[in-house]
UniProtKB/Swiss-Prot annotation:
Keyword Chloroplast belongs to the record: yes
The keyword Iron-sulfur appears for this protein: no
A GO BP entry: translation
Organism annotation: Spirogyra maxima
Upper taxonomic lineage: Eukaryota, Viridiplantae, Streptophyta, Zygnematophyceae, Zygnematophycidae
Gene: rps3
Protein name, per record: Small ribosomal subunit protein uS3c
GO cellular component terms given for this protein: chloroplast; cytosolic small ribosomal subunit
Assembly description: Part of the 30S ribosomal subunit.
Length: 218
């Protein structure tokens, strides 16, 4: 049953760190946790509606949130910071206002961008790339092969596994297909595993995409 556990939660405190860093009173904890989720969803929705179809779209790997007494700091790790700050920073201002509208807080909001050079070595970005290809009706085997090639070319990737489940290529019966290259040691705690589950909305229904990327051991 070891393979059933979430690869990131399994390694929290070992090779993974929390994406939300703050302290709160017990009575406020659930409200702030919900606020963090709203911030992340707002950023993803903004990117999906404004930037996702761009030819040089690089994706979002993770969103880190830190809270201080009078400040909420949001750090977006992305492969396309230039797209968010285009128009002399207007894109970032629009995003900031959109986030403020989605939450009710008296704290100041600060959004920073961290560029990822090898973004296809990030599970979230690679899973979103696969979803875009499947939604464009590209054959799933061709998509998996191309995604593995893109990831392995990044240099720091030691192994990768991709799994797609659903009505593949419009088949009547849903099934699961997967491909792997290199080592993906899910049982090794010191192994740096990046993982993402992402849904692809196709004309034949929803396809579930899972990506595991092994980046070495600590």
């Amino acid at each position: 049953m070891g393979q059933k556990i979430h690869p990131l939660g399994f390694r929290l405190g070992v090779t993974q760190e929390h994406l939300s860093n703050w302290f709160a009173r017990p009575s406020r904890y659930s409200d702030l946790l919900e606020e963090d989720e709203k911030i992340r969803n707002c950023i993803k929705e903004y990117v999906r509606t404004h930037i996702r179809n761009s030819s040089n779209y690089g994706g979002i790997s993770r969103v880190k949130i830190q809270r201080k007494t009078d400040l909420v700091q949001v750090d977006i790790h992305t492969g396309f910071p230039a797209l968010l700050i285009e128009g002399r920073g207007k894109g970032l201002l629009v995003l900031k206002q959109s986030v403020l509208n989605s939450i009710s807080t008296e704290r100041k909001l600060k959004i920073t961008l961290s560029e990822i050079d090898k973004y296809y070595a990030e599970a979230n970005i690679l899973a979103e790339y696969i979803a875009l290809q499947l939604e464009s009706r590209v054959a799933f085997r061709r998509t998996m092969k191309k995604a593995i090639q893109l990831a392995m070319e990044q240099g720091k990737v030691k192994g990768i596994k991709i799994q797609i489940a659903g009505r593949l290529n419009g088949a009547e019966i849903a099934r699961i297909e997967w491909a792997r290259e290199g080592r993906v040691p899910l049982q090794t705690l010191r192994a740096c595993i990046d993982y993402c589950h992402y849904p692809a909305q196709t004309t034949y229904g929803v396809l579930g995409i899972k990506v595991w990327i092994f980046k070495g051991e600590e």
